[in-house]
Regions:
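A short loop-to-beta-strand structural motif that recurs across blades of beta-propeller domains
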Residues: 60-62, 162, 206, 314
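Hydrophobic or amphipathic alpha-helical targeting/insertion segments
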Residues: 33-81
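Beta-propeller and closely related beta-pinwheel folds
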Residues: 11, 17-33, 71-243, 280-290
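Beta-sheet repeat architectures centered on beta-propellers
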Residues: 1-19, 23-45, 183-198, 204-457
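Hydrophobic beta-strand segments that make up the repeating blades of beta-propeller
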Residues: 50-52, 155, 199, 306-307
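Structural motif
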Residues: 53-56, 106, 259-261
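Generic beta-strand hydrophobic packing signal
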Residues: 59-61, 75-80, 94, 148, ...
Length: 457
């Protein structure tokens, strides 16, 4: 299995510790540890350098670096220390921007951002932990900082009720903070991500974007979540009770945001997924994933990996497998796709449905269930029972990995159509496809409905 190394060690030598000395050090206490923010500086080392700030705002930023070669941790040299930004300033947020470490959100200085000296190369003895050297400084804003993000040439500063950008951080004569808007703020810094060339974040009135324009240095605000405004409204109304986390799955062009209370159950944890399509964002909800922290990136082979962690300290491979495993226990995944109510262009005509054909894109063997409801689920008219669809197998390619005769299905399409006869009639109808099992994932591509008009009133 995987090997874990605790990195918050105390009294590490300035020149670094070998593996034996480092693992033998006492633990560096992280008082009131809460959700953390990570900043990674690639630098000149093989493994980069990492800075960790804590939203509990009870500790200084933690700095960690590892050097050396070889596949075993025992061949490495380890560096660890706490960063003194300014006295007892304990920032909550951190980011690397244009050769600087930038931090903000300290409880004692909520309106102030601090930036380190300029990071150029090792010959200048540049140090991520130095907030007093050449090029370092601080700026006080008019609003409380809730998040920071490097975006193109600017540092975007998200505040409670406004958004700013920091320009020319490396030019002392022209460094400036310019307002983007003083009417829109960010509800939680952990919602900020970059996807499709834009920044997205959770605001009081929805998921908003900050996008670059054709004009150099110009940005514009947009809104992309009108379809799920009721969900966003409920989330925004209670945002202070939730732990927010978010990430971007690049291979799927998806923005994912999760929210749950500090003591809530995994089963009750929720989230939203925004997928970029040619027609803009398409949205869905998640249930049963407790992600108090989540991250996505590429491994050494260029393969995207995503992990999340829950309140009990379990780390999970995200978006993999056919079932959830909260605390190591296999649990069904509940999936549901709901259509609007269709009147087929004439709400006054009663329609008798004969059958429907549904296009799926399965990732393995699946057998979902279909539910048809008439006239906005009117309880005063007969509603048909649920239909268990025919089992759908993943199509196989001859010679493919894991393909065996008498087991794999050959000659099938990647997006099979399933025909299901249905009963009932109404002026409108809706369809729900759902499953509660440990079978493979699937996408619903579309419907074909065959019906006959059966009267008008």
């Amino acid at each position: 299995g995987d090997s874990w190394l605790q990195i918050n060690k105390d009294s590490v030598a300035s020149g670094g510790d070998n593996y034996s000395t480092f693992t033998g050090r006492s633990t560096l206490a992280r008082t009131s540890q809460d959700q953390a923010t990570f900043a990674i500086y690639e630098g000149l080392t093989d493994y980069g350098e990492v800075i960790i700030t804590d939203r509990g705002s009870g500790v200084k930023p933690l700095y960690f670096k590892m050097t050396g070669t070889g596949s075993a941790l025992s061949t490495r040299t380890f560096f660890c220390e706490e960063i003194t930004v300014s006295g007892t300033v304990y920032p909550k947020f951190c980011v690397i921007h244009d050769k600087h470490l930038v931090v903000a959100g300290a409880a004692t200085a909520p309106n102030t951002i601090y930036y380190s000296n300029t990071l150029l190369d090792s010959s200048n003895n540049d140090d991520l932990t130095d907030f007093t050297g050449t090029g370092s400084g601080s700026i006080v804003l008019d609003d409380q900082v809730v998040g920071i993000k490097s975006f193109r040439d600017d540092l975007i500063i998200f505040c409670s009720n406004s958004i700013y950008k920091l320009e020319n951080i490396n030019v002392s004569a022209s460094i400036a903070v310019v307002p983007i808007t003083k009417n829109v703020g960010c509800l939680d810094g952990n919602s900020i991500q970059e996807i499709g060339g834009d920044l997205v974040f959770l605001s009081p009135d929805g998921i908003r974007t900050i996008a670059g324009t054709a004009r150099i240095g110009d940005v514009e605000l947009g809104s992309v979540s009108r379809q799920i405004q009721s969900i966003i409204g409920s989330l925004a109304a209670s945002v202070d009770t939730f732990r927010i986390s978010s990430t971007v799955l690049r291979s799927k062009s998806q923005y994912r945001l999760f929210y749950s209370t500090a003591t809530g159950t995994t089963a009750g944890s929720k989230g939203i997924i925004g997928t970029i399509t040619p027609n803009g964002f398409e949205w869905s909800e998640t249930l049963g994933i407790q992600a108090h922290a989540i991250t996505s990136g590429f491994d050494k082979d260029g393969v995207e990996k995503t992990y999340h962690g829950d309140k009990d300290g379990y780390i999970y491979v995200h978006d993999d497998g056919n079932y959830f495993t909260p605390a190591g226990t296999a649990t069904n995944i509940t999936a549901e796709y709901q259509t609007p109510n269709y009147d087929f262009g004439d709400v006054g005509t009663r329609k008798t449905l004969l059958y429907t054909r549904i296009s799926f894109s399965p990732e393995g063997d699946i057998q979902p269930t279909l539910r048809v409801r008439y006239d906005y689920e009117d309880q005063n008219i007969p509603q048909p029972g649920d239909y268990t669809l025919s089992s759908i197998s993943l199509p196989a390619i001859f010679g493919g990995s894991g393909v065996t005769f008498n087991t794999a299905v050959f000659g099938a399409t990647n997006d099979p159509m399933v025909r299901q006869a249905v009963q009932g009639s109404g002026n409108t109808c809706s369809f729900r496809i759902f499953s509660d099992d440990q079978k493979a994932s699937y996408a619903v591509n579309g419907f074909y409905v065959d019906y006959v008009p059966s009267g008008r009133r």
